From Swiss-Prot:
Compartments reported by the entry: Mitochondrion
Taxonomic path: Eukaryota, Metazoa, Chordata, Craniata, Vertebrata
Complex formation: Component of the mitochondrial ribosome small subunit (28S) which comprises a 12S rRNA and about 30 distinct proteins.
UniProt GO BP: mitochondrial translation; peptide biosynthetic process; translation
Species this protein is from: Bos taurus
Domain of life: Eukaryota
Gene name, Swiss-Prot/TrEMBL: MRPS11
UniProt name for this protein: Small ribosomal subunit protein uS11m
Amino acid sequence: MQVLRNSGSWLLRSWAWPPTTRVVAGVPAPTIHMSAQQMQDAAAKEEVEKAETPAPAPSRSSFSIYPPIPGQESSLRWAGKKFEEIPIAHIKASYNNTQIHVVSAAHQPLARASCGTEGFRNAKKGTGIAAQTAGIAAAAKATGKGVTHVRVVVKGLGPGRLSAIKGLTMGGLEVISITDNTPIPHNGCRPRKARRL
């Protein structure tokens, strides 16, 4: 009975406290009597070896497909400009019209176009073809002022949302990012009644 009790306690002790190797400052200590000076020398030697190895090159895993947050440092450049310095194309897509304003990063107006200024009248202003034509016209005016890349900010739920972006790319502008800035009420004003067809 005593032998069984001793072997059981040995199993419990070996399971609870597994044997470990003595490691001090990343260097295994061969004996307990190793002097402090030898341990410091071994740790210093290891630090020198780590410092001599070159830093690894940035990997593809650190690259992000998403544009940087304004104010965040990034190495990405478009035509030599940072993300915050790229002009912005504001698209307001209502159900009756689509308006496009291209402004500089400092919010100075560069180009403006809408479906009405492109010759569409009445109900035709609210179509996708009219929005695409307005996008091409706004892109042509902006490229005439030296704009090559734009950030797009879309507001509204009209039928010309995507057509206007397509028109900007067809007009020669390269779209860097698309932001949806549509206002969403948190149960604000009462909406208009539904149409009966």
